[in-house]
């Protein structure tokens, strides 16, 4: 009898302790980086609407993969744990060895974001050698640059574009973000690449600098790419057609669309384990946060004003539709041979 009472008391304490535990946002970066700052802003505002404390736990690692793997293999089974993922995680899901799988999770909310590319004012895409300081996250950006510099190439195969790329581009890996900015301003590098907020902070209004293009954002309802309302008349496809007299097409373009949308449509996103009993509550709190003018203003000050997506099944279906054997293999080949990235082909993604 006493033993039963004791076990009951222990169980009650355990349940109360679990109920009182803080919600935790897992961020796969060290403090101070872009997604980490976004996660801190989300935590601060989300707890106002969820009615419970929300803390941030940083789990940094190579290419921001270990933290997401930790969530997948262990932490997602805690009912109060939320994963904060970024666009690089989306590209790594396609092209790197990872444990995590978006189709095992419930989407709580995703900001459909963009990336801004700049060049020196008056630089002619059709001539000269361009030096680009690249790195992780550049996969779709530099593919778009290659198409703008090279235009239509033979049968528009990956090999056709690699030939032009090697003739027109000097690709430099291993340069930090601050060094990239300084190198661009000093004329050492020919391309600038930033988040919308960083573009406005570091480049807007600087003499000799020119906003070159953006990728646009996904219109999920119609499953098409539309112009970024924050940067009108800068859509990559429109600029390409203006330069070359026809719309982009071919193998590199299909690989570009694959990595672009897997990066940008989930560039700042929140996930919980599928079947998590708290997911509906957290999702509703995120909806309230989005609709609150004070909270949303603080978030948009960091990211720019971009739409949120909370329909996980529709978003993942749209992204899944881009994964074909051809596009996946071409993305791997381009990343390996143009950038020197250790990308791998993952046939399991076709299932």
Label every model-predicted segment:
Residues 20-105, 136-141, 149-204, 293, ...:
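N-terminal (or domain-start) structured segment
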Residues 8-14:
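Bacterial N-terminal signal peptides
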Residues 1-8:
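Sec-dependent signal peptide recognition
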């Amino acid at each position: 009898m006493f033993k039963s009472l004791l076990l009951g008391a222990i169980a009650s304490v355990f349940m109360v302790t679990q109920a009182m535990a803080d919600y935790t946002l897992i961020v796969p970066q060290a403090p101070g980086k872009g997604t980490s700052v976004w996660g801190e802003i989300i935590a601060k505002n989300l707890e106002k609407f969820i009615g419970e404390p929300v803390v941030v736990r940083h789990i940094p690692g190579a290419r921001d993969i270990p933290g997401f793997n930790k969530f997948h293999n262990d932490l997602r089974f805690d009912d109060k744990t939320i994963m904060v993922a970024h666009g690089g995680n989306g590209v790594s899901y396609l092209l790197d060895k990872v444990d995590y799988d978006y189709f095992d999770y419930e989407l709580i909310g995703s900001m459909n974001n963009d990336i801004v590319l700049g060049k020196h004012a008056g630089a002619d895409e059709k001539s000269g050698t361009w030096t680009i300081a690249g790195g992780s996250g550049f996969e779709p950006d530099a593919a778009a640059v290659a198409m703008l510099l090279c235009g239509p190439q033979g049968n528009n195969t990956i090999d056709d574009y690699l030939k032009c790329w090697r003739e027109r581009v000097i690709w430099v890996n291993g340069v930090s973000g601050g060094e990239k900015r300084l190198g661009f301003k000093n004329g050492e590098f020919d391309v600038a690449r930033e988040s919308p907020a960083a573009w406005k902070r570091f480049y807007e209004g600087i003499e000799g600098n020119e906003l070159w293009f953006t990728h646009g954002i996904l219109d999920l309802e119609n499953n098409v790419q539309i112009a970024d309302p924050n940067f009108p008349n800068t859509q990559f496809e429109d600029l390409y057609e203006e330069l070359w007299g026809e719309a982009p097409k071919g193998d590199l373009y299909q690989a570009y669309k694959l990595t672009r949308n897997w990066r940008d449509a989930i560039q700042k996103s929140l996930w919980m384990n599928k079947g998590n009993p708290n997911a509906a509550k957290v999702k509703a709190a995120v909806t309230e946060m989005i609709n609150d003018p004070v909270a949303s203003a603080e978030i948009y000050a960091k990211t720019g004003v971009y739409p949120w997506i909370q329909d996980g099944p529709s978003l993942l279906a749209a992204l899944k539709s881009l994964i074909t054997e051809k596009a996946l293999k071409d993305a791997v080949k381009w990343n390996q041979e143009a950038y020197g990235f250790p990308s791998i082909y993952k046939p399991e993604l076709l299932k």
